[in-house]
Amino acid sequence: AIACIWKNGVAQNLTDGSTLAKVNAICIDGGVLYAAGAEKVSGGRWKGVLWKDGQPTYFTEEVGTEVTGLYVKEGKYIIEGNMTADSGDIVTCIWTEEGVQVISEGMALCQGTGLAVAGSDIYVAGNAYDMDYGTYEEIYRSPVWKNGTEMALEVVSSDNFTVWGLACAFVDTQE
């Protein structure tokens, strides 16, 4: 499959079809179009890629990368998603020009599902699955992290909900 974007109704290919590729998030900053996704270069696992005005930059090796969020300001990017770690765990991550930060340490299966940035704070949402091997009970939960630290969410039942997306709004409390 060819990774492409549409601008004013016209498709613009990001790849030539020699690989399997996809775009999962787009963002415009300073007139520059950013598209984040993944590409299977050699038929193995997905490799994370950021296209800047159509030019690719790879931000992971072939580690089963899935992108679910992109934020760009003044040319600096934050990409959110998940990848398969060396241990085989699926972990939620953010990638910047400085490298990768694993957000979901200690969780065997946690998919990133949303990214929001408010000022200098980075919020990431995810869906996690685990197993209580004593009772063989499946455990599902949806953590939200602020700057890499998991936040407590007020919910009626913490074992029966998922988070697919995240948004931040500023509320001016000063009059």
List the predicted regions and their residue ranges.
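Residue-level hotspots at or immediately adjacent to binding/recognition sites across diverse folds
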Residues: 1-175
